[in-house]
Amino acid sequence: IVSISAAGIPVAISIMIAEKLANDDMRGVQQVFFVSLRVLAILGLVFSLALYGSAQWLVDNQIITDPRALIAIQLLSPAIFVVTILSCFRGYFQGFQYMVPTGTSQVFEQIFRVSSMVGLAYYFIDRGLHLAAGGATFATFPGVLAGLLVLIYFYYRQRNIREQMLSQQNPNAICESNGTVVKRLFSLAIPVSMANIMLPMVSLIDTFI
């Protein structure tokens, strides 16, 4: 889900939004964005809770061979939920070919992630290596949260532009159902994500060999 969100979802949303913009269909743009946001927020929450809940099972069944990784896995789970939402906003701005928000959010994301990683690892290092690793892993969460807040800020700033574009809505634009939007979203996102998933999958398989 992280690979799909990081790579496939922004590309898929940007393609769909660019098509709507080419047809002066701002209502369609809003539909693509909000439908994608709702669906991915639900999926992100489900996968986040599933990862947290299954962490102990993964360790008990030695799928994760080092039990000290339990805390790190559990602390990674909140970031999954935020990453899915973050990907929607990045895809939205990429569809407008407006890359300043994405670039700015990536800068803030790395600043908060690295500073949190160093700070938490340093704080917990004397309390145990597993806690230090967990703290460093958890640093992903404040990083992606900072990136998301930056994108929300840019989205709020664009409200006047959106209202102006809605007033120029193409009356002949075709209205798609929400189900069609969701199907197209994943039909575009999954193939793009396969390349990103292959390398982690190979590494995962290597751990079992």
Pin down the residues of each PLM region:
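Membrane-interface junctions at transmembrane-helix termini in multi-pass inner-membrane proteins
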Residues: 83-105
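Transmembrane helical elements of multi-pass membrane transporters/channels
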Residues: 143, 147, 151, 175-209
